[in-house]
Amino acid sequence: MSFFSKFFTRDKKETLDQGLEKTRSSVFEKITRAVAGKSTVDDEVLDEIEEALITSDVGLDTTVKIIEALEERVARDKVMGQQELMDMLFEIITGLMQHEGGLWEDFELPKTEGPYVLMVVGVNGVGKTTTIGKLAHQFKQKGYNTVLGAADTFRAAAIDQLVVWGERTGVPVVKQQMGSDPASVAFDTLQHAVSKGADLAIIDTAGRLHNKTNLMQELSKVRRVMDKVIPGAPHEVLLVLDGSTGQNALLQAKAFAEATQITSLAVTKLDGTAKGGVVIGISDQLNIPVKFIGVGEGIEDLQLFNPQAFASSLFNK
């Protein structure tokens, strides 16, 4: 398909297909069994489709929206064969994941005055620092002069892990000692980025949701300080979520969205889980674009998200 040649190499499509294998088994194969041999879509078929969507962590609200859209189409067309039904599901699901201006066709930065600033948030254990390391690699491969800021200062391990990623990717890391003021680290990082003529600064921040008020105040301070160094920074606030936690990822996303303005999402650890349907629910419920998905452990396996490619992989197209 010309579509895939535009967004993916064959290797990337294979990686995506492999990464979504368990979710595809959970969604596509169950739906296929539900509609096999049926010339009409009755309540039993709709119930089985609903169950398949819910068990793959699409979420109740989004599942209801999908089923209602199907019911409306079935009522209008009266008779719908298996392929027509699958095509309609594909269209509905793809539509729920599309957001205006949310799609990047490549790892290419928007043009800004000075360095482009990407602030990354997320709780411990979701793959936040790993995502930053993989992003640094991808952007460096594109020729962007990148710097990382270790502003998750509440865990020594977070600083150390980012330093390791910096060494692995050949990207400098600005850091202070554990317990330092995160805003101070962000300030130093952006000053370094400006002085070195960097194209991109990625700031790792803490994500301690147990006290939302403190988190809100901390992130607000970081943002204010960055804006003083580079007006308009951060240009992007990326929330990293663990896709293998299913609906818990959606709850986390809602909590973070209440604490600070989130402009995009990265959903990690989709390989090895049958809960990849949560990407559909998150895209629909939050109205925040998913920009990146993690579909493997390799450094290249953080992919740009594309709704049509994701749905095509789920539906084995």
Annotate each PLM feature:
Residues 1-17:
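Disorder-to-helix initiation segments
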Residues 3, 105-106, 135, 251-253, ...:
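Short beta-alpha junctions and helix-cap segments that line functional grooves
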Residues 17-151, 158-178, 186-203:
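Primarily NTPase-proximal linker/entry elements flanking Walker-type ATP/GTP-binding cores
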Residues 60-62, 155, 271, 299:
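Short hydrophobic/aromatic residue motifs in ordered secondary structure
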Residues 121-122, 204, 240, 294:
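Short beta-strand segments
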Residues 152-153, 243:
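Residue-level signal for short, function-critical loop segments
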Residues 161, 178-196, 210-316:
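Conserved catalytic-core segment of NTP-binding enzymes
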Residues 206-208:
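Short glycine-rich anion-binding loops that position phosphate/pyrophosphate groups of nucleotides
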